[in-house]
Amino acid sequence: WKPFPQIKKHKTKLKIGYVSPDFKNHSMESFLKPVLENHNREEFEIYAFAQLSQEDDTTLEYKSLVDHWVPTQGFTDLEMVKKIRELQIDILVDLAGHTKGNRLGVFAYKPTPISCSWWIGSGYTTGLSAIDYFLTDDVMAPPGSEHLFSETLCLLPSHAAIWQPDLQKMGSVNRLPALTKGYITFGTLTRAIRINDNVIKAWSEILKRVSNSKLIINSSDFNHYKNRRMIISKFKEYKVDSNRLEIGYQSPPWDIMRQIDIALDCFPHNSGTTLNEHLYMGNPFITLSNRPGVGKIGASLLTAIGRGEWIAVSEEEYIQKAVNLASDINKLATIRRSLRREVNQSPIMDHKGFVQKLE
């Protein structure tokens, strides 16, 4: 890439461009919308470069939250670079990483003076030297991990992102299920690709140590019978019978979350949005802090809400923390009643304060 040509023009506002294929019904919206809603419009002019083949109701909401909407579907990389330079964008923000529909090819041309990638779209480094910064925090990218990123780390204060729950859809927190059922229900709502042999082994050990407990695995990947059969067979290798498992898919997920007492995060690739949702529905989760970036998403979130005691650094500690949490039903019921309040009072819900620091 060639260095960005200096533009000799006095501007009253900095122009920020967000680039994404996900300006639609997508998990990113709960992280991005509160940012767009709280940008200081007296100092910043906000552009959305939307790589969309189809719009929906959420797209209309995004359009109302930005100053300029720029559809990019059908643009070649060079055509998009030309457009960005014509608009004199100052800071270009990638929200997709290497996920489907990304426009990293555009960033490779360095069309703006400053560019950055934010973890909410992917979680990994882009690998592009043309992108200047990676927005994260010091839990997801602790000291000593700089060499794992092609970008310079830009450590955001308190937490790497804010979050906005959909209260109308989520509803209220229910009574701890174990008080009615008489046994602990563990659960996860993650994608199947994150569930590997080590995760299944750890979950199996937890089930064996917590008498009569069950595990809910809810994911669209398990709509398919062959996938359900495959994962059941994996648990069977670790002596866990299928009657301890509830595997399937139900959407929206709130009623499933109401059946769960304790959520279990995956490793080395943590879950994402569902971790926030679990906490807001009163479900504590156990996470194993692993590789920088996607392996520390859970640790970053728990640190932000002041629940570092649910962060493990080894598989055995992960298992033991889950077992210990399940051993005191009354304490678990108290946690369920307090978690939503704890999240509301945490940095992830300080939307205005976060955006001021981001700016």
Q: Can you annotate each of these PLM segments?
A:
Residues 1-183, 201, 232-240, 251-262, ...:
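Alpha-helical solenoid repeat scaffolds of the TPR/TPR-like class and their adjacent stem/linker regions
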Residues 295-306:
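Short acidic/histidine- and often glycine-rich active-site loop of Leloir-type glycosyltransferases
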Residues 19, 189-191, 218, 248:
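Short hydrophobic "strand-cap" motifs at the C-terminus of beta-strands
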Residues 274-275, 298:
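Short glycine/serine-rich donor-binding loops of glycosyltransferases
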Residues 278-280, 303:
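Short alpha-helix at the nucleotide-sugar/activated-sugar donor binding site of glycosyltransferases
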Residues 187-198:
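Substrate-binding clefts and catalytic carboxylate motifs of secreted carbohydrate-active enzymes
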